[in-house]
Design a protein with these regions (language model features):
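Short polar/charged helix/loop
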Residues: 5-156
Length: 156
């Protein structure tokens, strides 16, 4: 995504969760954007409301979160970063584009073996509205449902 603040994090967390659920080994999910901003707090709250354990590791302009999807697995480390951040892989990965703006603006992702657009509407348009929590949950569940289908089709 462009700002690596909402959809890409929801997708990272749900993809890693689905890989674990379907017992697909050697899948490690990351997120990145064309810009680094911050993981939007409503994303962490939405994930927590869906049953994930969320802990803030560091509080600053770009907080770092520990996101547990299973008691027996390492947590996902969530923070906003650019696609080429040292935290992300440099080669042998598939780039899933969750934002149509980034999909159009990034025709080439260095190191990606595959580039797959699965775009979602940005829940940002509901920030600071009475529908915010509902719409973030709706988007999170849409992403979870799509990724459930994707990972159910993979033969481990």
């Amino acid at each position: 995504c462009t700002h690596n603040s909402r959809r890409s994090h929801l997708s990272q967390v749900w993809a890693q969760t689905m890989a674990n659920y379907f017992n697909i080994k050697n899948v490690f999910c990351y997120s990145g954007g064309t810009e680094a901003t911050a993981l939007f707090p409503m994303v962490a709250e939405t994930l927590q409301n869906s049953g994930f354990q969320i802990n803030t590791i560091s509080k600053n302009e770009n907080p770092v979160y520990s996101i547990k999807y299973s008691n027996n697995e390492h947590p996902i480390i969530g923070f906003s970063k650019k696609l080429d951040d040292e935290f992300n892989p440099k080669s042998e990965f598939a780039a899933i584009m969750t934002c149509s703006q980034a999909d159009g603006g990034c025709p080439f992702i260095a190191g990606a073996e595959k580039r797959i657009p699965i775009t979602f509407e940005d829940p940002k348009i509901f920030d600071s509205t009475p529908q915010q929590a509902e719409k973030y949950n709706e988007r999170s569940m849409q992403i979870a449902t799509e990724l459930f289908h994707v990972f159910s089709q993979i033969n481990s």
